[in-house]
Amino acid sequence: MGLLSQGSPLSWEETKRHADHVRRHGILQFLHIYHAVKDRHKDVLKWGDEVEYMLVSFDHENKKVRLVLSGEKVLETLQEKGERTNPNHPTLWRPEYGSYMIEGTPGQPYGGTMSEFNTVEANMRKRRKEATSILEENQALCTITSFPRLGCPGFTLPEVKPNPVEGGASKSLFFPDEAINKHPRFSTLTRNIRHRRGEKVVINVPIFKDKNTPSPFIETFTEDDEASRASKPDHIYMDAMGFGMGNCCLQVTFQACSISEARYLYDQLATICPIVMALSAASPFYRGYVSDIDCRWGVISASVDDRTREERGLEPLKNNNYRISKSRYDSIDSYLSKCGEKYNDIDLTIDKEIYEQLLQEGIDHLLAQHVAHLFIRDPLTLFEEKIHLDDANESDHFENIQSTNWQTMRFKPPPPNSDIGWRVEFRPMEVQLTDFENSAYVVFVVLLTRVILSYKLDFLIPLSKVDENMKVAQKRDAVLQGMFYFRKDICKGGNAVVDGCGKAQNSTELAAEEYTLMSIDTIINGKEGVFPGLIPILNSYLENMEVDVDTRCSILNYLKLIKKRASGELMTVARWMREFIANHPDYKQDSVITDEMNYSLILKCNQIANELCECPELLGSAFRKVKYSGSKTDSSN
């Protein structure tokens, strides 16, 4: 989760005093990198995935499942057995926000050959097996986007009660500080977001109104004025960073051949973010309730919203410099490529001094405004030992701001003094239950980048429409019921990367005629006379490629999953979870998820993930039935 510096963290007041210093030197560090590597070309399109996991413990006797606060210990063992022993170990493990979470990636990035698509699932299985092998009896490693009873009494093992005091990190009524990773970055981020904002974060998620759900649904917080003011009727109220950053996701990073190719990919994939997010929807439950949303994006956005009342437009500007329209965790605000420029229709708040400085240093308008927009934010964590740096050889101040702008896409300059290329990160996906599904989504997105570059595809629409799509994508059953703005003619371009833009730029078409509302089924599978469909385009690309039979078979299985999720033939994880709870014998149609219902659900998820049972409505028949890891968690029931 971004920059992990070691040392003594500063309080918000101390960090604030150094904010201008961090910004000033962050820009100098960016300029050093830019001038050193702006002409760097890479032959190979490298890429890699990141999967976040939760550690859970099953109490089969009492029918409870809890999150195990042993992430640091598990991580230490995994690193000791893996990368520290063998630098070429096939897996890498990193800490995540929750002390019940870990993050796993392949040990080395994947390369540009088609056959590497066939190794993704095997590597994910290796990760799952590796981490599972060191867990205790009745514990499991789960890829679940949001734990349904996160923040409910007794959701952790060992059980810890929240202690909502000012001196703590989150001051939460529900989420104890002990559930935050012990690395000082995480608790400092939590505390400093709250202190900068001037109050606790506020998350209100609409509750799903079932037959017996109280109407209006109102929770009372008599002990806490802040919660009483912040909570809304008919909403599930949450008050801590952990409710967002304590969820799991699936991300992919690509290394492009050049900076211009990275900018082109960044823009094209930005339009795809809401579509893939809706397709990967996996988080319908929050704080023990059934919600009316299927994706975590808005929850995580609110959970790290450090904007003051002035910046949110609730009070006149006095102590702050800007009105800021979005949280630090949200969708992108500007396209970076020349062909994206005419679709930049969102008002962009920028630091004008930084923007002018970047222009004077030879940075073009689009990249300058992107960086100047990121740098309207304050640093949230700072370590005493890391204030004065060598700007020519270090990038911590740049990364400090860059890595706490959590957007749908991230444009990543190479680290200083490395041979890494310019990269982009695709960040909107929800993690799926199985390695098969996670591989399918990763391979789909990576293949899409290959096709975008090979066929010079153009998905660009006005950025405000992408934002509207992001809102639709989070709604319940968006994959089947949502309509999304999408470009009609995506095959217009000339040599998009070299020319900096496709021919569409020169056309006299009105932007409004270039796009229309489509269903996800139409976007993914196509509709005669309306849109060719992304999967048919990927299939035609595959037909023209040299691909061995085994790899082709794997890829087709992955694409079949995406195709059927888009058409509704298969359920999203979110839809499947809703049906599971709705059909549970204990469910009273009141939107409440009890301990026992949660236990049944997570146990089933774990059985599916370890291929101990089939789930055709979620996975279809393409799911390969290969037994690959002994489970420590199966109950005798």
From Swiss-Prot:
Its Enzyme Commission number(s) read: 6.3.2.2
Residues with the modification N-acetylmethionine, per the entry, are M1
- What is a single cellular component term in the Gene Ontology annotation? glutamate-cysteine ligase complex
**How changing R127C affects the protein?**
In CNSHA7; strongly decreased glutamate-cysteine ligase activity
* Pathway note: Sulfur metabolism; glutathione biosynthesis; glutathione from L-cysteine and L-glutamate: step 1/2
Q: Tell me what reaction this enzyme catalyses.
A: L-cysteine + L-glutamate + ATP = gamma-L-glutamyl-L-cysteine + ADP + phosphate + H(+); (2S)-2-aminobutanoate + L-glutamate + ATP = gamma-L-glutamyl-(2S)-2-aminobutanoate + ADP + phosphate + H(+)
Keyword Ligase tagged: yes
Write down the InterPro entries for this protein, in alphabetical order: GCS (IPR004308), Gln_synth/guanido_kin_cat_dom (IPR014746)
Activity regulation reads:
Feedback inhibition by glutathione.
Could you tell me which residues carry Phosphoserine?
S5, S8
Give the keywords, sorted. Acetylation, ATP-binding, Disease variant, Glutathione biosynthesis, Hereditary hemolytic anemia, Ligase, Nucleotide-binding, Phosphoprotein
Q: Which molecular-function annotation in GO is an example for this chain?
A: magnesium ion binding
Q: Does the keyword Transmembrane apply?
A: no
Database matches in SUPFAM superfamilies: Glutamine synthetase/guanido kinase
Q: Which Pfam families match?
A: GCS
- GO:BP terms for this protein? blood vessel diameter maintenance; cell redox homeostasis; cellular response to fibroblast growth factor stimulus; cellular response to follicle-stimulating hormone stimulus; cellular response to glucose stimulus; cellular response to hepatocyte growth factor stimulus; cellular response to insulin stimulus; cellular response to mechanical stimulus
Disease per record: Anemia, congenital, non-spherocytic hemolytic, 7: An autosomal recessive disease characterized by hemolytic anemia, glutathione deficiency, myopathy, late-onset spinocerebellar degeneration, and peripheral neuropathy.
**Function, in words:** Catalyzes the ATP-dependent ligation of L-glutamate and L-cysteine and participates in the first and rate-limiting step in glutathione biosynthesis.
Q: Which family does it belong to?
A: Belongs to the glutamate--cysteine ligase type 3 family.
- Cite the record's note on assembly: Heterodimer of a catalytic heavy chain and a regulatory light chain.
Name of the protein: Glutamate--cysteine ligase catalytic subunit
What is the phylogenetic placement of the source species in the record?
A: Eukaryota, Metazoa, Chordata, Craniata, Vertebrata
